[in-house]
Amino acid sequence: MDIVSLKFIGVGLMAIGMYGAALGVSNIFSSLLNAIARNPAAAENLQRMALIGAGLAEAIGLFSFVIAMLLIFS
């Protein structure tokens, strides 16, 4: 295998990071809806914490995407 083939395999593996971020965000908001359904009075506090968690999970996916683009175009 040459170096170009290995670069594209690495980019394909970076998709796992983006897949994990998508699963994390969906899990966060699924849990948020369940928690708000159980305790509507705490909705504001729960929503704030969920958005912070979703932002952190999404950042991992964006870092993975940036690294994949660096691998492709370098």
From Swiss-Prot:
It is found in: Cell inner membrane. GO terms for cellular component: plasma membrane; proton-transporting ATP synthase complex; proton-transporting two-sector ATPase complex, proton-transporting domain. Disulfide bonds: none annotated. The record marks E58 as: Reversibly protonated during proton transport. The chain crosses the membrane at residues 8-28, 52-72. It comes from the Bacteria. Keywords: ATP synthesis, Cell inner membrane, Cell membrane, CF(0), Hydrogen ion transport, Ion transport, Lipid-binding, Membrane, Transmembrane, Transmembrane helix, Transport. The keyword Transmembrane helix applies. It is a multi-pass membrane protein. Its main location: membrane. The keyword Transport applies. F-type ATPases have 2 components, F(1) - the catalytic core - and F(0) - the membrane proton channel. F(1) has five subunits: alpha(3), beta(3), gamma(1), delta(1), epsilon(1). F(0) has three main subunits: a(1), b(2) and c(10-14). The alpha and beta chains form an alternating ring which encloses part of the gamma chain. F(1) is attached to F(0) by a central stalk formed by the gamma and epsilon chains, while a peripheral stalk is formed by the delta and b chains. Belongs to the ATPase C chain family. F(1)F(0) ATP synthase produces ATP from ADP in the presence of a proton or sodium gradient. F-type ATPases consist of two structural domains, F(1) containing the extramembraneous catalytic core and F(0) containing the membrane proton channel, linked together by a central stalk and a peripheral stalk. During catalysis, ATP synthesis in the catalytic domain of F(1) is coupled via a rotary mechanism of the central stalk subunits to proton translocation. This is ATP synthase subunit c.
